């Protein structure tokens, strides 16, 4: 898609919508889009698709990071997202207010409340409800079936594609957290009404990890 294909003129104001790719912020105005609801123009960088795919001959980045450490990190991310001084969240709301049908005050509240998911007890509950033995996320767990046959089981990091809605910033937070807890390699398809929240969360995480 380019400027001509969506009927833009040079006078149109364009909102920047950067990507976050393998730990790096990617900015640019190579591709112009229109938001579905308000018809606002926003620009994204053009990226080499090979960079999006994590090489299969490399170990997934989170595979050997303990689950407890991942949850600690997610909890700190939640605290940073609730911080009124977080520049990435402020910038996200500023941009989203231009492309979204919801009022700015509602967007601000949704973004703040989304961070409530990053609660230690809640995150542990999510893991325990989905994994009979959460230790399998960190190590090989011995098993024995009814015949006495022994084996070892470990949850291997999956490759996940998340298709995110544009009317709920909380889904971005949940998707990032759940993908992290199963140590996945994640690709997020973002909505035209909110191509900003996911990037703001990831930038906050990268700032913690500096």
Language model feature labels by segment:
Residues 83, 207-210:
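Secondary-structure boundary motif
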Residues 127-208:
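Conserved small-residue-rich beta-alpha loop and adjacent elements
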